[in-house]
């Protein structure tokens, strides 16, 4: 009788351990996590990346940990977030490096820890990552230069509202812009170029206003990202004349900038696809974890849009996650 009781107790214990094991296995599967770290969290541009990442996570049953610094120049904070996610043993990291040099050790640490890292939006000076998914930013700068060259008929004085140095994406845009003007439109002169410090829309407004005040007879302006485009547009409105309008080309889709394009307050915008960066970045990590091949570099596309293309279904789809 006693033996029968002990056999029963033993069987119950084994069943309990098996059940706990199954629960733990289920918990592990449910807790698959991918960290997504933008350059900053204040710009609406990064909302597109977040939405794309969340959609991919939902489809693959992965949790998305979204965290980033409040402003893009806070490299130390971004590095700390990468370190924290490594300690959390996330399954992978999607990272938009705020500085192509400063983030190198953090990216290489993910590689050393065998945590797949997909770099999005902006490059980093190492190859110790799974994949790089971004706009061809040099091409974006080329498109902006060609547009401003066209609307100014190859002659005039222009301003450039630049961005924080060592941001690989904006550095490439500005390089493409300047080199294309020099080669294809030698009659156009960049008479002034400044970047906002700190990198806020208010400061972008101030530096644009200062340049417009210092330089008379300006014909055009290029703002190289969403923050500078928003600040430049608000400053520009106070300097426009009915008989001579300063032609502005912006980059990225801030709601007020898209509204300005619709009203004719600026000439055109260069658009990226941040949703695709977030979506494909997460998907690439999951494919890698399944043993599938992942391309080392992916071009996520770039578009020039003018007022007449704003309501094109393709453009509206592109804007949906950004405004």
Question: Can you name each region flagged by the protein language model?
Answer:
Residues 6-10, 168-169, 180-182, 187, ...:
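Hinge/cleft segment of the Venus flytrap/periplasmic-binding protein
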Residues 35-52, 56, 65-84, 88, ...:
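Extracytoplasmic "Venus flytrap"
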Residues 35-37, 89-97, 116-120, 159-162, ...:
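Periplasmic-binding protein-like
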Residues 57-71, 158-160, 183-200:
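Short beta-strand elements in bilobed, periplasmic/extracellular small-molecule ligand-binding domains
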Residues 78, 133-158, 172, 202-205, ...:
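Hydrophobic alpha-helical segments within soluble ligand-binding/sensing domains
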Residues 86, 94-111, 177, 197-259:
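Hydrophobic alpha-helical
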Residues 100-139, 157, 163, 254-262, ...:
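Flexible loop/hinge segments that line or gate small-molecule binding clefts
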């Amino acid at each position: 009788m006693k033996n029968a009781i002990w056999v029963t107790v033993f069987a119950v214990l084994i069943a309990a351990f098996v059940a706990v094991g199954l629960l733990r296995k289920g918990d592990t599967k449910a807790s698959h996590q991918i960290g997504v770290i933008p350059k900053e969290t204040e710009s609406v541009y990064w909302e597109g990346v977040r939405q794309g990442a969340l959609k991919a996570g939902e489809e693959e049953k992965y949790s998305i940990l979204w965290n980033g610094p409040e402003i893009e120049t806070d490299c130390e904070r971004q590095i700390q977030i990468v370190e924290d996610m490594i300690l959390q043993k996330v399954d992978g990291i999607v990272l938009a490096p705020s500085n192509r040099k400063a983030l190198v050790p953090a990216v290489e640490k993910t590689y050393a820890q065998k945590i797949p890292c997909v770099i999005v939006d902006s490059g980093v000076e190492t190859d110790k990552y799974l994949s790089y998914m971004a706009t061809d930013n040099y091409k974006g700068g080329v498109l902006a230069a060609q547009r401003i060259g066209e609307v100014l008929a190859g002659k005039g004085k222009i301003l450039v509202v630049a961005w924080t140095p060592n941001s690989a994406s904006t550095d490439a845009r500005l390089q493409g812009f300047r080199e294309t003007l020099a080669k294809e439109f030698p009659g156009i002169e960049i008479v002034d170029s400044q970047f906002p410090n700190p990198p806020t829309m208010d400061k972008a407004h101030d530096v644009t206003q200062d340049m417009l005040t210092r330089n008379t007879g300006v014909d055009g302006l290029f703002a190289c990202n969403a923050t500078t485009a928003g600040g430049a547009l608000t400053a520009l409105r106070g300097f426009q004349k009915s008989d001579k309008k300063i032609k502005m080309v912006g980059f990225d889709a801030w709601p007020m900038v898209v509204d300005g394009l619709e009203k004719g307050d600026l000439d055109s915008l260069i658009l990226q696809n941040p949703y695709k960066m977030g979506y494909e970045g997460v998907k690439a990590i999951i494919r890698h974890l399944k043993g599938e091949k992942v391309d080392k570099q992916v071009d996520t596309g770039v578009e020039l849009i003018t007022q007449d293309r704003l309501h094109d279904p393709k453009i509206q789809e592109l804007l949906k996650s950004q405004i």
